[in-house]
């Protein structure tokens, strides 16, 4: 079966409809808050190390996504933390020669470093730069997979930094994918660059720009090999240019990534935009840990005093600026959740009374005297579950569905700040807590997360956009929680 990714009757197409309908509102919040935090951390060793680790992660994962090599997870983390050295690649940790893998990793990291340089030099995207980027990414690759006239797989010499001269028709899942024919690649690439320039001029949001540029580039598939790596580098360029994080697509994201690209093939760019937003949230959560590291690592008195003054100034009037806006969002979301749980409680209670006739379900709100255990649970599990460090001093609230039958369980939505000092972002963390009494009358609590990620929102987001995102996320959480409750009756 043949799948035409690039269509000759249209070529690459513009963004369909109003781009505002595609945007992810939290990305602008990430841009603003990360920009403020990055400025505070400017010149710090922690910021430099974070950027280096991020670049190394990008370099490793972009090759894994393209099946250049495999590296096991433990070694991946070692390489991210300690640079690319062949001795870290023990026997069996990769499926390719160690020195070759290290060369590819260094090439890919150097290429991303080149993207950062491109942005800092305020250069404009051009076809010549895209060729330059391709040459950097594939510097150590000399051959690529091909097919001979007898339909046998062979290795063919790789052409770097120039457009393909033979049709590119890879096969996946029994389908043959066809892209732009070689004779039209140059004109289509000119159109791609012109389209990107128009988006920049018109202020199209970064996540939409990145999704469009990535997908339309892959539709053209201008190079003999390495198109996926170049596409992710171009998307990263757009995001970094906007003050965001590079596009780190990990092996765990691969299925969703390919599905999003296939949705874009049939005209729906939104899943790819949403994936980019999700990956930005993931990097932002990692970035919030830097401030905590600096607060703990500061040994200079003046630096410590400067940090103290910044926090004191921020806490001077909690009703103004970013704090007031963020806290107002949190109160609205908590109230919406209280109303939703109040409607849900009767159905849950009716179900539990099939098991225990005296079962009861009530909605409970945050109370100072009962908050401490929940704060402890959140502090202990936030990083393990969701990869961030909580700040319950800046803000905390919770809404809870308290269920008592033969067992006792609490379904909790906990709201609190992130970052130290508070950076204008808050999260909602949902979890189930089951409490059981053992034969010695000791109560054991078991906590179960009921979401893939915490809900992250920002002071700079519009109230209606935060609420729209939250309601969709919350309904998915409710489904997961009810399934867990069913499994633990």
Show which residues each predicted segment covers.
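FIC/Doc superfamily catalytic core
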Residues: 1-224, 229-489
